[in-house]
Amino acid sequence: DNSYKVSGGLHGVGVSVVNALSKKLHLTIQRAGQIHEQEYCHGDPQYPLKVVGETDKTGTTVRFWPSELTFSQTIFSVDILARRLRELSFLNAGVRIVLRDERVNLENVYDYEGGLSEFVKYINEGKTHLNEIFHFTTDADNGIGVEVALQWNDSYQENVRCFTNNIPQKDGGTHLAGFRAALTRGLNSYMENENLLKKEKVAVSGDDAREGLTAIISVKVPDPKFSSQTKEKLVSSEVKPAVEQAMNKEFSAYLLENPQAAKSIAGKIIDAARARDAARRAREMTRRKSALDIAGLPGKLADCQEKDPALSELYLVEGDSAGGSAKQGRNRKMQAILPLKGKILNVERARFDKMISSQEVGTLITALGCGIGREEYNPDKLRYHKII
C-alpha cells in the first residue's frame, strides 16, 4: 500500500485511456511468485487474465501499439521521451531508467544518485554559480514529503520548477507559494541581522531575491488537489505551510552555516534591487519623452506624414550617412527613417537597467511608442505596423 500513497494518478483512467486508443495492448504482471498476462485489441480483452509462469520478481510491463484509426501519426519522439524520463530519474534518486530506440539502435540510461542536486547541476551547466547546491529532504507531520534543491547563478532569470508526486506544475501552486515565502523571509532576516539593508540603503523584493535562482521543489502528497485535470497547478492548502516550515528551518540554517555563500547571494540580491530601482527611474524618464523629443536624440527620427499606424512604415538604418540617403529616397507620406549609431546592445544578455539606459534602445522604445516593462507595454500603441 505504501507504494501508492503518493501516486500521481487521481482518476484511474491512465491505462484505460491508453488501452482505448491502442490497436493492441499487452500486460505482463509479476506478483506473488507468479507471472500473469492479458492482451487487448482496440480496448477489448482477447482472453481473461491468466498465469503463464513463476517468478521471484515483482513489477508490471505494459506494451501498447497506438491505433492508426485514431492517430494520423504514430511516430514517437525520442527527445520528448528522453526529457521526461531524465526528469523522472532526477526526481527519484537511485532509480535507473533505460530508454531504447530500436529504430536507430539507440540506448540512453538515466541513473542519478544525487536526485534533485543533480537536476539543478544539469540545468545550471555552463553557468557560473554563486553557491554550492543547497538540498534537503524532509517529511512533515501530516505525511507530506518535501524536497528542495537550489542554487544561484550569474544570470538574471528565475528558473523554478515544481512537482507533486513526480507530476510537473508549470503554473506552480501552494508548494511554490510556501517556498517563495520562506525564501524571501530567510534572506531578509539574514540581511537585516547582518545590517546589509541599512548599510547599502536598498529595499529588496521577492523578485530581487529570485534573480538568477535555479530551484526544484518536489512534494509527495497523499491526496493532492489540482486546479484542473491537467494538474498544472497544485491547490492543496496543507502543502503551503508544510513547505514553508521545512524551508524556513533548513534554509535559515544553511545561511548561518555557509557565511561565504550567504554573502555572495546577498550581494547579488542587493545588485538586483539597485538595478530594479535604476530601471524604474529610467523607465519613467523614457515614458516622459514624447515622440517629439526624439529629434534631440543622437538617432534622429524623420517621421512620416501618415497618422494611421496600419499605413505607416519605420525603417531602421545604420548611421547618419545611411539615414541621409534613406531620407532622400523615402516616401514621406508613409515611410519614417530612424538612424541608429554604433553597435546596438544585445538585450537578451543585458540586465533591464542596462538595457533601458542604452541611448539607442531608448530611442527605439520612444519611436515605437508602445512602452516597455510588464506594467507599461501596450502593443496597441505601436506607431508603425511595419518595421524594417
Curated annotation (Swiss-Prot):
PROSITE patterns: TOPOISOMERASE_II (PS00177), TOPRIM (PS50880). The record marks 343, 346 as: Interaction with DNA. Residues 312-388 form the Toprim domain. GO terms for biological process: DNA topological change. Pfam families: DNA_gyraseB, Toprim. Its EC number is 5.6.2.2. One of its GO terms (molecular function) is DNA binding. It is an enzyme of class 5 (isomerase). It is found in: Cytoplasm. Keywords: ATP-binding, Cytoplasm, DNA-binding, Isomerase, Nucleotide-binding, Topoisomerase. It comes from the Bacteria. It catalyses: ATP-dependent breakage, passage and rejoining of double-stranded DNA. GO terms for cellular component: cytoplasm. The keyword Nucleotide-binding applies. A type II topoisomerase that negatively supercoils closed circular double-stranded (ds) DNA in an ATP-dependent manner to modulate DNA topology and maintain chromosomes in an underwound state. Negative supercoiling favors strand separation, and DNA replication, transcription, recombination and repair, all of which involve strand separation. Also able to catalyze the interconversion of other topological isomers of dsDNA rings, including catenanes and knotted rings. Type II topoisomerases break and join 2 DNA strands simultaneously in an ATP-dependent manner. Few gyrases are as efficient as E.coli at forming negative supercoils. Not all organisms have 2 type II topoisomerases; in organisms with a single type II topoisomerase this enzyme also has to decatenate newly replicated chromosomes. PANTHER family: DNA GYRASE SUBUNIT B, MITOCHONDRIAL, DNA GYRASE/TOPOISOMERASE SUBUNIT B. Heterotetramer, composed of two GyrA and two GyrB chains. In the heterotetramer, GyrA contains the active site tyrosine that forms a transient covalent intermediate with DNA, while GyrB binds cofactors and catalyzes ATP hydrolysis. Belongs to the type II topoisomerase GyrB family. This is DNA gyrase subunit B. The lineage of its organism: Bacteria, Pseudomonadati, Pseudomonadota, Gammaproteobacteria, Moraxellales. The gene is gyrB.
